[in-house]
């Protein structure tokens, strides 16, 4: 429990806090500076782009998957799935993001919704992605149960998350927070989960944890040293984690 009030009120309090936070970001951003909310944002977005284009596209060679992107924001990453998918749906609870996405992209379908409420989204999906969202929720089991209901039972179907590493040193002091968070986010307490919490929550949700990996997303000038940094630096130097689940 993250607060000492009833579950319903606690969840609403947290949801309202993050809703106000995202609205503040949306109302004060413009298209040109969105990717540069922190020094690491550009590299983080670039990593996700490469993962979608180079990795996910190769995992679905036998059929074109139906894709659900939860927390799609303005659809910049969502649109990339259209290159190899039969249908792509993006969901975000911030209306401004959905309006922006619909104005920019014609092929993906975009809807207002959130990770706790996917009932209005029709059908099941071979791939569910949730990039940078879990640090904004407190009920991991409930989120996973909702996702499971949307995950198809076809071969290779999976759900993929990226989120913040709980053990990251970049969560521990003011200088590190300036490097890894936007100005609006640096004073917020984000929710992080251990590997064991992911494992236990997946079991309770009817899913199984199939991959858990520390990501070393580095500033571009350190890119050539990535291999050595992964070998010699502890996992606390990884600010992000990659999590994959499938039906149990």
Language model features: what each stretch is:
Residues 1-61, 64-71, 160-182:
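Conserved class I S-adenosyl-L-methionine
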Residues 74-117:
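Class I SAM-dependent methyltransferase SAM/SAH-binding core
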Residues 129:
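A conserved beta-strand element that flanks and buttresses the S-adenosyl-L-methionine
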Residues 132-136:
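Short catalytic micro-motifs in class I SAM-dependent methyltransferases
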Residues 141-156:
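A short glycine-rich, Lys/Arg-flanked "PGG" loop and its adjoining helix->strand segment in the class I
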Residues 180-197:
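Acceptor-substrate binding/catalytic loop of class I
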């Amino acid at each position: 429990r993250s607060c000492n009030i009833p579950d319903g009120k606690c969840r609403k309090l947290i949801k309202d806090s993050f809703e106000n936070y995202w609205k503040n970001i949306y109302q004060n951003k413009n298209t040109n500076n969105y990717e540069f909310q922190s020094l690491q944002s550009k590299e983080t977005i670039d990593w996700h782009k490469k993962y979608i284009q180079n990795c996910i596209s190769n995992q679905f060679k036998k059929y074109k998957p139906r894709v659900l992107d939860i927390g799609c924001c303005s659809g910049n990453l969502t649109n990339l799935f259209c290159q190899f998918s039969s249908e792509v749906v993006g969901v975000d609870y911030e209306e401004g993001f959905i309006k922006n996405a619909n104005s920019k992209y014609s092929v993906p379908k975009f809807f207002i919704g959130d990770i706790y409420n996917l009932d209005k989204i029709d059908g099941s999906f071979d791939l569910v992605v949730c990039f940078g969202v879990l640090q904004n929720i407190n009920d991991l089991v409930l989120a996973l149960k909702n996702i499971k209901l949307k995950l198809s039972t076809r071969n290779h179907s999976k759900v993929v998350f990226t989120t913040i590493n709980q053990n990251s040193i970049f969560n521990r002091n003011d200088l590190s927070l300036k490097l890894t968070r936007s100005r609006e986010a640096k004073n917020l307490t984000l929710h992080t989960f251990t590997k064991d919490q992911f494992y236990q929550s997946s079991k309770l949700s009817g899913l199984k944890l199939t991959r858990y990996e520390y990501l070393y997303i580095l500033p571009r000038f350190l890119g050539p040293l990535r291999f050595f940094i992964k070998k010699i630096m502890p996992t606390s130097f990884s600010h992000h984690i990659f999590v994959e689940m499938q039906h149990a």
